[in-house]
Amino acid sequence: MPVTVTRTTITTTTTSSSGQGSPTIVGSPRALTQPLGLLRLLQLVSTCVAFSLVASVGAWTGPMGNWSMFTWCFCFSVTLIILIVELCGLQARFPLSWRNFPITFACYAALFCLSASIIYPTTYVQFLSHGRSRDHAIAATFFSCIACVAYATEVAWTRARPGEITGYMATVPGLLKVLETFVACIIFAFISDTYLYQHQPALEWCVAVYAICFILAAIAILLNLGECTNVLPIPFPSFLSGLALLSVLLYATALVLWPLYQFDEKYGGQPRRSRDVSCSRSHAYYVCGWDRRLAVAILTAINLLAYVADLVHSAHLVFVKV
């Protein structure tokens, strides 16, 4: 039967009585000499160099520096685990679905490193005085960019192609789930100060929208990583379609309400950045209130587009049990 190039087949696992639902995957030390293995070695080295440069001079004070250091250390650690698993052929014993885990992590790592490559130089490095610490911080940013490109390349290499039988997380909707949850986490970071939304019920609704959609998308990811999609009381494809549709509707309301109540004077908003006293001067390691409001508005629009794309692409998936 010819392959239908407009559709991608997704494998889902039906857990047997013995608890073994996924096929055995055998690794080989030779995997490290293959293009993907060499790419992961580049990821390992670049993240290691990034956090080593920063740690050697202590250039990671404050929340932005801490975030960047966490990003590089986390990506290095998980990449090392993936390489060890493949080197020792332990994929079958790995607690999560090996069909879904590596590409899920690669997508998250690309986004993490991208955020660190932007946040670290703009909110931390520019405030460092010229000298050894600044030079190390700039070099760390460079290696962070290399890591970002390396992880993004892995995603491009291993994502599902039309007509291919693969895990859900390798498909466009699966990768969009990663983007949706990551963007939601960034939104939560920007609204960590409750004064940004507690004065208006409409803004509190927006925060509830971000939380609800994040939880549902995270559940979808965890169900795939744990290969337990069959525990849902409804078919998994129906759950995904309902999740995408609900998220589109909820985010549409947030996209209207958040800018309206944050930037329109009629609803108590601040239309001009100059009126926000916290933005009157530059602060190291700090993003002022008006900039946070604007960032959340932009991220809300990005996530709405992601959910719309998720809804559209989900219609082109075919699920089969293995």
Swiss-Prot record:
Q: Where in the cell is it found?
A: Membrane
Which residues are annotated as modified residue Phosphoserine in the UniProt record? 22
Q: Which UniProt keywords apply?
A: Membrane, Phosphoprotein, Repeat, Transmembrane, Transmembrane helix
Q: How does it sit in the membrane?
A: Multi-pass membrane protein
Q: Does the keyword Membrane apply?
A: yes
Q: Which InterPro entries does this chain map to? A: Marvel, MYADM-like
- What coarse category fits the chief subcellular location reported for this protein? membrane
Extract the ranges annotated as region (Disordered): 1-25
Signal peptide location:
none
Q: Which GO terms describe its biological process?
A: negative regulation of heterotypic cell-cell adhesion
What do the Gene Ontology cellular component annotations say?
Answer: cell-cell junction; plasma membrane
Question: Keyword Nuclease, does the record have it?
Answer: no
Domain MARVEL: residue ranges: 31-163, 168-319
Q: Where are the transmembrane segments?
A: 41-61, 70-90, 101-121, 137-157, 171-191, 203-223, 239-259, 294-314
Q: Give the record's family classification.
A: Belongs to the MAL family.
Name used for this protein in its record: Myeloid-associated differentiation marker
The organism encoding this protein is Pongo abelii
